[in-house]
UniProtKB/Swiss-Prot annotation:
PANTHER family per the UniProt record, alphabetical: SIGNAL RECOGNITION PARTICLE 68 KDA PROTEIN (PTHR12860), SIGNAL RECOGNITION PARTICLE SUBUNIT SRP68 (PTHR12860:SF0)
GO biological process: response to xenobiotic stimulus; SRP-dependent cotranslational protein targeting to membrane
Membership in a protein family: Belongs to the SRP68 family.
Protein source organism: Mus musculus (Mouse)
Intracellular or extracellular location(s): Cytoplasm; Nucleus, Nucleolus; Endoplasmic reticulum
UniProt free text on domains: The N-terminus is required for RNA-binding.
Modified residues (Phosphoserine): 47, 240
Function description: Component of the signal recognition particle (SRP) complex, a ribonucleoprotein complex that mediates the cotranslational targeting of secretory and membrane proteins to the endoplasmic reticulum (ER). The SRP complex interacts with the signal sequence in nascent secretory and membrane proteins and directs them to the membrane of the ER. The SRP complex targets the ribosome-nascent chain complex to the SRP receptor (SR), which is anchored in the ER, where SR compaction and GTPase rearrangement drive cotranslational protein translocation into the ER.
Listed GO MF terms: 7S RNA binding; endoplasmic reticulum signal peptide binding; protein domain specific binding; ribosome binding; signal recognition particle binding
Alphabetical list of CDD domains matching this protein: SRP68-RBD
Parts forming coiled coils: none
Protein name (database record): Signal recognition particle subunit SRP68
Length: 625
């Protein structure tokens, strides 16, 4: 029997064959498939020892499945592709081991027994059975959102995966298998069992299985080097949200905070637990919303009777804290979008309640028309939250673009580098949002609010004007840029003079003093660049006679250095030659014709008249001469 290269630690051959096999399976090429079979048949140094039971069998279970999953579809969540890979790899292993299930016409079931454990590929065969069933279950889980009936099939495939994992664990209990493989098999079985109990919502059994899996992987991680422990620690991090979710459903109310932190760290949208986690957080906020009856904003308290608005306002502080603690810009942007989406939903709910309230206001007394209703004031508050969040998001994007602009990396053809025009557009949107804030109903008489918004408007106008000046510098319009820099200093000085009494409103805004320092340095650089550009333009004017595209044949009398004459594009003569004017052909007029005398024709006319009728008749009968 042909032996295969062993996988790491006595069993790397299975992992290697899987990666190579996946390439052939996905590519579909004949040569790739031949390479896979050759890899399965490659002999290993320890195969004879395994046959004689002198060495222990070893299989890096977690490493094999992680590498196979990343290389064959799971990086993009394509479980169907991974299931196809598992089937193809199973078929190759059975063919290599001569362990076929009958022939084309008849199926003969065979099970891997302890007596067959002469090669670690028999363990790999059972592992691929479990992985194939698990990947099919995960594929059905994705489809079960639109087709609930598929959930029954999902549970069936998970049970089958657990059955194969238990068979793998039973085989690994043999004395021929080393201790590390035994522990990995136990952890793998516990993980799949926990997944099955989790889907059945048997929270206590699920948390016991997940804790067992976590304990084994933590022990394995502490027993090996840091490089080998990375995979085990990653698996522990994957299991932790499931454990906390089960703990919450058992009755641990403190688990909800840890789940929200896990959602923040993971990005919130990845993993099969994401939907249940979002539903759990919404459900928890809904329970807390029952105790919330009013909200206070800018000295006025308004009742909150709409459940959707209550849920949004309760989660507002958590969302803002999550944005502050976000580690990456992608996570921060996603949280901003999520918060804006929730705010829009809350605003829509208030608008639906405002429609009948607006009809009642039409019949209200004129004396009461000066004060907006509580519902309208609540709408203004939610609009303020939405616009303020949009301003913060655009300001955060502008800071990122500004950092990229200052780095001045070389331009890449595949990725467009940021330009000052991009920042100008963002600050235009911010200023538009500030104008909308000034027009909110119920805040017309709030002088403090109006002053704060006016101050913020000056700050963002200064930054917008600064980047407009930067765009003029790029096209070497020095005078326009200098005027705009002066305008920036004017705005910044106004903010500094009026911002002393409103320091609280400026604490979240960009530093104006830093902008003033930067503008002053930019003005010095601009003036120096303008002087250099003037000298360059003067030199260009003096040398412009060389580059007037006059051919050499027309300027023999003047000497000038023209480097283009020694190139293949030398301008020597006009070719094709240009057209030159020539005299036209003269015109001749026959003026002598008027003075020519022609002979008389009277005698001929008389002869023709004499013939008359007789001549005509003779002509008919053919007697005319």
């Amino acid at each position: 029997m042909a032996a295969e290269k062993q996988i790491p630690g006595g069993g790397s051959g299975g992992g290697g064959s899987g990666s190579g096999g996946g390439g052939g399976g996905s590519g579909g090429g004949r040569s790739a498939g031949g390479d896979e079979n050759k890899e399965n048949e490659r002999p290993s140094a320890g195969s004879k020892a395994n046959k004689e039971f002198g060495d222990s069998l070893s299989l890096e279970i977690l490493q094999i499945i992680k590498e196979s999953q990343q290389q064959h579809g799971l990086r993009h969540g394509d479980f169907q592709r991974y299931r196809g890979y598992c089937s193809r790899r199973q078929r190759r292993l059975r063919k290599t081991l001569n362990f076929k299930m009958g022939n084309r016409h008849k199926f003969t079931g065979k099970k891997v027994t302890e007596e067959l454990l002469t090669d670690n590929r028999y363990l790999l065969l059972v592992l691929m059975d479990a992985e194939r069933a698990w990947s099919y279950a995960m594929q059905l889980k994705q489809e079960a959102n639109t087709e609930p009936r598929k959930r029954f099939h999902l549970l069936s495939r998970l049970r089958k995966a657990v059955k194969h994992a238990e068979e793998l664990e039973r085989l690994c209990e043999s004395n021929r298998v080393d201790a590390k493989t035994k522990l990995e098999a136990q952890a793998y079985t516990a993980y799949l069992s926990g997944m099955l109990r989790f889907e059945h919502q048997e929270w206590k059994s699920a948390i016991e299985a997940f804790n067992k899996c976590k304990t084994i992987y933590e022990k394995l991680a502490s027993a090996f080097t840091e490089e080998q422990a990375v995979l085990y620690n990653q698996r522990v991090e994957e299991i932790s949200p499931n454990i906390r979710y089960c703990a919450y459903n058992i009755g641990d109310q403190s688990a909800i905070n840890e789940l929200m932190q896990m959602r923040l760290r993971s990005g919130g949208t990845e993993g099969l637990l994401a939907e249940k986690l979002e539903a759990l957080i919404t459900q928890t906020r809904a329970k807390q919303a029952a105790t919330m009856s009013e909200v206070e904003w800018r000295g006025r308290t308004v009742p909150v009777k709409i459940d959707k608005v209550r849920i949004f306002l309760l989660g507002l502080a958590d969302n803002e804290a999550a944005i502050v603690q976000a580690e990456s810009e992608e996570t921060k942007e996603r949280l901003f979008e999520s918060m804006l989406s929730e705010c829009r939903d809350a605003l829509q709910a208030v608008r639906e309640e405002l429609k009948p309230d607006q009809k009642q206001r039409d019949y209200a007394l004129d004396g009461e028309s000066g004060k907006v209703s509580n519902l309208q004031y609540l709408h203004s508050y939610l609009t303020y939250i939405k616009l303020s969040t949009a301003i913060r998001r655009n300001e955060n994007m502008a800071k990122g673009l500004h950092r990229a602009l200052l780095q001045q990396q070389p331009e890449d053809d595949s990725k467009r580098s940021p330009r000052p025009q991009d920042l100008i557009r963002l600050y235009d949107i911010i200023l538009q949002n500030l104008v909308e804030l000034l027009q909110l109903p119920g805040l017309e008489e709030d002088r403090t609010f109006q002053k704060e918004i006016s101050l913020k408007t000056l700050v963002f106008k200064a930054y917008r004007c600064f980047f407009i000046a930067q765009s003029y510098v790029l096209v070497k319009k020095w005078s326009e840029a200098l005027v705009l820099y002066d305008r920036v200093l004017k705005y910044a000085n106004e903010v500094s003079s009026h911002g002393g009494a409103s320091k609280n409103s400026l604490k979240d805004l960009p530093d104006v003093q830093e902008l003033i320092t930067q503008v002053r340095s930019e003005k010095c650089s601009l003036q120096a660049a303008a002087i250099l550009d003037a000298n360059d333009s003067h030199q260009t004017d003096t040398s412009s006679q060389v580059k007037d595209n006059t051919p050499l044949v027309e300027r023999f009398e003047s000497f000038c250095l023209d480097p283009s004459l020694v190139t293949k594009q030398a301008n020597l003569v006009h070719f094709p030659p240009g057209f030159q004017p020539i005299p036209c052909k003269p015109l001749f007029f026959d003026l002598a014709l008027n003075h020519v005398a022609f002979p008389p024709l009277e005698d001929k006319l008389e002869q023709k008249t004499k013939s008359g009728l007789t001549g005509y008749i003779k002509g008919i009968f053919g007697f005319r001469s």
